[in-house]
């Protein structure tokens, strides 16, 4: 993502309020299995194939999400 500014997030588990900021900022980040408080982050490539998925409640969800966004997360224009 040369020439882009990364929007990084907390390295701790994510809260519901942070979900909106992430899916608003990145065009290939989606929410899956959303029954309320617990959900999964999904990053898809340009062809729609899943590149990565994790639960928001995992201890290092934010750390791994930031790493994946650095390589696979184009910002919305």
UniProtKB/Swiss-Prot annotation:
Disulphide bond pairs: none
UniProt xrefs under Pfam families: DUF905
InterPro entries linked to this entry: DUF905, YkfF-like_sf
Family: Belongs to the UPF0401 family.
Name of this protein: UPF0401 protein c0279
Organism: Escherichia coli O6:H1 (strain CFT073 / ATCC 700928 / UPEC)
């Amino acid at each position: 993502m040369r020439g882009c500014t990364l929007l990084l997030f907390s390295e701790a588990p994510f809260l519901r309020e942070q979900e909106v900021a992430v899916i608003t900022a990145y065009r290939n980040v989606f929410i899956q299995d959303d029954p309320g408080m617990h959900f999964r982050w999904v990053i898809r490539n340009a062809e729609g194939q899943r590149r990565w998925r994790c639960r928001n409640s995992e201890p290092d969800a934010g750390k791994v999400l930031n790493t994946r966004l650095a390589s696979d997360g184009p910002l919305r224009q």
